[in-house]
Amino acid sequence: MLDLDLRRRQGEFRLDVRLSAGPGVTALYGRSGSGKTSVINMVAGLSRPDEGSISVDGRVLFDSRSGIDLPPEARRLGYVFQEHRLFPHLSVRGNLEFGQKLLPSAERTQSLDKVVELLGIESLLDRRPAKLSGGEKQRVAIGRALLASPRILLMDEPLAALDPARKAEVLPFIAQLARRFSVPILYVSHSMDEVLRLADTLALMDGGKVAASGPLESLMGDPGLRPLTGRYEAGAVIGAVVSSHDSGFGISRLAFDGGTLIVGRSELPVGAKVRLRIHARDVAIAIEPPDRVSIRNVLPAIVVSVAPADSFLVDVILACGPTRFWVQITTLAQAQLNLVPGMRVHALIKALTIARGDVASVD
């Protein structure tokens, strides 16, 4: 458990952060200048709060009242930066072993072979960094940080310098880290796609403060947080399981608490647990079940709430069993449908609107 109570003034900018981050991946998300990198650098010991405290699993790293301020090398934290920062004169193996050599053998909790296998870098061990692609360099940097046996792994926009293809290469490895190695991760990003793929817990930062924090699914489905999560990111994040594939039609079926969704053919095996994003703008509402319609996902639902978003849009929350969907419709549509809480309706979701990138494995 990472516990933060941080205050610092930098010119006109005031940072005032209180946050507890447990197991899994906690994402710090916010606009540029909201204070995300300042927080992670204070945790790492690269900058100093004016006052407050930092502790990991009850071990105090910083406390302004008692005068505790451990240097970075004594904090047992791994840090992955935007740039790989590998040693150019060492091979990949040498860079990885450097992380291990920082600790006595008895304190090493991670195996070189296990890290190399997870990150898929067996064939790179004898190469120098200059001979690696951007994605390969970042995977090696992640491995070096892991082999320092950190109590928590800090990642400051580790994919920001990569092109889309290299990001797609590295993301699956990061997604497995917390689960395979039981290392909590504090992940800084301004990319909602990355956050939705990786985070268990979301902390929304705004103006130097944590404006809201909690389970990813809860925060992403809250219309009141739209100014922080982004208008075009609005929607539901739900858990599901791959229940079947149909190669003849090129589709997969995903079972969730509330029904089954048809999506484009997934490469994930039957039984795989996934996280699924459904944009609020991609859901339609019908009062009666439609007849002979091309939309494959027609889900019985109950209206939970209806609230104006602006002069053009209305936010509607639907319940399909215990699962909530956030839907955006026009004010004209609301005037014609006259939706009210408790009304029975049908949610319509085109299979084509659920992109492959919106379905992520959580196994």
UniProtKB/Swiss-Prot annotation:
Residues 1-232 form the ABC transporter domain. ATP binds at G30, R31, S32, G33, S34, G35, K36, T37. One of its GO terms (molecular function) is ATP hydrolysis activity. Residues 292-358 form the Mop domain. It is found in: Cell inner membrane. It catalyses: molybdate(out) + ATP + H2O = molybdate(in) + ADP + phosphate + H(+). It is a peripheral membrane protein. It is an enzyme of class 7 (translocase). It comes from the Bacteria. Its EC number is 7.3.2.5. One of its GO terms (cellular component) is plasma membrane. Keywords: ATP-binding, Cell inner membrane, Cell membrane, Membrane, Molybdenum, Nucleotide-binding, Translocase, Transport. The keyword Magnesium does not apply. The complex is composed of two ATP-binding proteins (ModC), two transmembrane proteins (ModB) and a solute-binding protein (ModA). NCBIfam families: modC_ABC. Belongs to the ABC transporter superfamily. Molybdate importer (TC 3.A.1.8) family. Part of the ABC transporter complex ModABC involved in molybdenum import. Responsible for energy coupling to the transport system. This is Molybdenum import ATP-binding protein ModC. It comes from Paramagnetospirillum magneticum (strain ATCC 700264 / AMB-1).
